Swiss-Prot record:
Function recorded in the entry: Catalyzes the attachment of alanine to tRNA(Ala) in a two-step reaction: alanine is first activated by ATP to form Ala-AMP and then transferred to the acceptor end of tRNA(Ala). Also edits incorrectly charged Ser-tRNA(Ala) and Gly-tRNA(Ala) via its editing domain.
Co-factor remark: Binds 1 zinc ion per subunit.
Protein name stated in the entry: Alanine--tRNA ligase
Record localization: Cytoplasm
GO molecular function, one term: alanine-tRNA ligase activity
Gene for this chain: alaS
Pfam families: DHHA1, tRNA-synt_2c, tRNA_SAD
Domain notes: Consists of three domains; the N-terminal catalytic domain, the editing domain and the C-terminal C-Ala domain. The editing domain removes incorrectly charged amino acids, while the C-Ala domain, along with tRNA(Ala), serves as a bridge to cooperatively bring together the editing and aminoacylation centers thus stimulating deacylation of misacylated tRNAs.
Catalytic reaction(s) noted: tRNA(Ala) + L-alanine + ATP = L-alanyl-tRNA(Ala) + AMP + diphosphate
CDD domains: AlaRS_core
Amino acid sequence: MDIRKAYLDFFASKGHEITPSSPLVPDDATLLFTNAGMVPFKSIFTGEIPRPNPPRKTSCQTCIRAGGKHNDLDNVGYTARHHTFFEMLGNFSFGDYFKEQAIAYAWEFVTEVLKLPKDRLYVTVHENDDEAFNLWQKHIQKERIYKFGDKDNFWQMGDTGPCGPCSEIFYDQGQEHFNSSEDYMGGDGDRFLEIWNLVFMQYERSADGVLSPLPKPSIDTGMGLERVTAIKEGKFSNFDSSLFMPIINEISKLCNKTYVYESGASFRVIADHIRSSVFLLAQGVSFDKEGRGYVLRRILRRALRHGYLLGFKQAFMYKLVDVVCDLMGGHYTYLNEKKDFIKEQIRLEEERFLSTIENGIEIFNEELKNTKEIFSGEVAFKLYDTYGFPLDLTADMLREKNLKVDEEKFELFMNEQKARAKASWKGSGDKTASGDFKNLLEKFGENHFVGYEKAECESKILALLDEDFKEVSTLKDAGWVMLENTPFYATSGGQSADSGFIAKREVLDTQKFFNLNLSFIKAGEELKVNDIVHARIDTEKREQIARHHSATHLLHHALREILGSHVSQAGSLVESNKLRFDFTHHKALNKEELESIEKRVNKMIINSSEAILENMPLEEAKKSGAIALFNEKYQGNVRVLTLGESKELCGGTHVKNTAQIGSFYIVKESGVSAGVRRIEAVVSKAALEFVKNQLEELSKVKDELKNNDILSGIKKLKNEILSLKNELKNSSKTELDSKNIQGVEICVKRIDNGDIKAMIDDFKNKFAKAVILLIQVKDEKITLAAGVKDVPLKAGALVKEAAQILGGNGGGRDDFATAGGKDLSKINEALKQSLETIEKAL
């Protein structure tokens, strides 16, 4: 049973809009990953954005719980139900239906769709929620409803804000399978398993803890797909379900060891962690030394260490990507699109770690001999620093020995290293590199960007650096220049850098390193520290960049206006000849939406609105309605740009009036990752060039069609194609030789031309009972097809047998199937075998 589909279809039938899973990396600065189904709707629940229309949503949300506050990493593999990656089924009502319908829907789905036995179901409610208690009695006996306090049955998002009582549905896995003293409703045993949590968000909690009723209460429910699948399939562990066993079986095949649950923790760790790794990589998270990328690295390296225990000495995790994509790519189609990339990234990370893991484990085992209770923090740091063992991996290895690591000493060594290493010194730049940046900051402080007001200026050279970012006193080769005052804008916020000249040296790039604005120059005449030089930007390039940057602001406004306020910027690139804007949205834009957006942007351009730039405190800017981006870090006063109806925080360069943008054309719309779309567009000179190219293409089409009326020419061409197709179809209706055996018309032969499917359909239509298998060769490629009508023989099996003789494979329905082959020399053998198979079956 496809529970994911059944759930979404069920709630769609109840008026819920199906919302695709949002990205695992949320637009929420307080979260490392999306860790619950309600996260994408958080702004609606908190009232930051209006209630959507329709006010009913349902989703299957991918979630990660590893790192941060919600971290299940250490438990994965050792329990039946902990996962780093899981799918959360949920239905949501934003001020629409409330308890009565939420309870009724849940009961209907569990008992009528999942068909779970009613005598195995129990319910909990909050001890003060008599309304929910009474509503449940319409569906289940009073004796099966339990009341608990705030700890178990009250949910809140934070210390303040929306909150409310919740009701949970439990499934009794059977007394005969459990014997713990905690196996009772409300106990810590595994017999009674919570499968669904219904949150009744009916209060607002103030800072002083007072609960006030919400005028329009909401519903937020969550049911783990892995858990409910295991229950439906009669398994006591999620890992024994159909969601995991294909992965575990593949691991077993690769290591040539049989999976046994009692000793199979390593199998389970790997099966869980490959799912997390695949999804995180597919959604743009990459292996890194910090942040989300480091969590991904920890997950994979923990799996690799368990692989080592199973005997894997070479990269193997990447070989599991195919089975994950086979299992989940049908619903999450982007997995298949990025499969090759994911496999390559995992393989490279495996090879990095496997090159050191053996030596690291030797050091670990040696220290283990000297450990009674607490493992040395110094050795744990050495494992981390030299051999790439994350601290929690060392802790995981010690857990198996009932030992702990000295985390305090580990942190001491970590802090000492940070204090010593310049590369670990952090600033707020857009680009990181190792170099003499800290020395420069200590000597000079931050240099000054004067490019908002000036396109050129006289300035003193404060420092020169070679290509490796080492300070030099003179520079003739290519390298970096730090000016006291610089007109060159550094790559930041998606806007590309200025170019131009410093003295006679061409500036190719400008970047920020820890708030130092440095320009990269070509080799040329010698420059010296303390020289006074003339710096000037390429004003034509700057103007074109400004036009494209201002257009991104108008585009962002148009997207939010036309698609909805859920749209937010997920990335951008602004260059002199194009712009690229990534934004959150759950589906591809259709032609009408794109036309509306393009039209809206051009209207704002034509309105000739003056650009208004203001500097103000961040909170004041937010109160004024200015849009701030989650992934940007703002400090002190911020720069607010108003362009007509658009108002955003931005440090880039812009036009003075929207009319300067010229024309705006959308060139392409595409998907970036789950829940993120991309628009590419051009303005000004690039827009004129785009239109010119389009007209030239149309002219070429006219020439090819030999018709100035393109639509008429295409229509004529379509008619000709249709006519040729009909001729081809008619030619395929050639009489096929056949013979009759016991009232069944049989045809097995090779054909050279014609539509093979049409020929089979025609043959089947002529007879009451028929079996036909045809083999066709075109361009050295073999195509097989079989059809069966009212005969106890399966077309899929028939065509598969023939294809295997020809070195291929295939299959299909019982009445029609296709396959491919490679070995032309065995066609006669395949025909002969197929005929024998048919005759035997009759």
